């Protein structure tokens, strides 16, 4: 599944303004081997760049739909464009995430979070959002299957305990 063209243009606009982004969410899931439908485009962005990123999105015709740990945008004129979520993380977290060597796009120029970070984000989402449970658990299971040997079982257990709690490992792997 190919990333929509407007996502490439958006990434380039951010690059021109020296605001780094990392592709996350469903498109990162697809990049890491599990192709599935996604109804938005998630980017990780440093909180240090939040004000500039919001101003850039507004200058490109996007309106804020809601703000929390992420800011969701919709284009004010082109309603067929997918919503865009900017997920805000600390400067330190962004620096760690940006060490990923994963790239996507026709010119392989779009930075993507690495598999371990993606799993950590999916596990963290499980902790607080029951309505997301099914989708995120499936993502984790399929990502582990598609990337056998990349993340060890012990490392997955550690990630589960750290980001989703002590029972998450059994839940994710359907262990009674």
Segments from the language model and where they lie:
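Compositionally biased terminal segments of proteins
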Residues: 1-176
């Amino acid at each position: 599944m190919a990333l929509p063209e407007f996502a490439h243009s958006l990434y380039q606009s951010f690059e021109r303004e020296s605001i780094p982004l990392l592709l996350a969410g469903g498109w990162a899931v697809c990049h890491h081997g599990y192709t599935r439908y996604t109804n938005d485009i998630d980017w990780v962005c440093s909180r240090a760049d939040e004000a500039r990123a919001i101003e850039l999105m507004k200058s490109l015709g996007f309106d804020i739909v809601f703000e929390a740990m992420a800011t969701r945008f919709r284009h004010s004129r082109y309603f067929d464009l997918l919503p865009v979520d900017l997920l805000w993380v600390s400067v330190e977290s962004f620096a760690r995430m940006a060490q990923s060597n994963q790239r996507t796009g026709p010119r392989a120029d779009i930075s993507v979070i690495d598999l371990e970070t993606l799993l950590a984000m999916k596990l963290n989402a499980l902790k607080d959002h029951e309505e997301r449970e099914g989708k995120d658990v499936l993502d984790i299971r399929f990502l582990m299957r598609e990337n056998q040997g990349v993340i060890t079982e012990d490392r997955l257990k550690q990630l589960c305990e750290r980001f989703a709690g002590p029972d998450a490992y059994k839940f994710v792997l359907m262990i009674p």
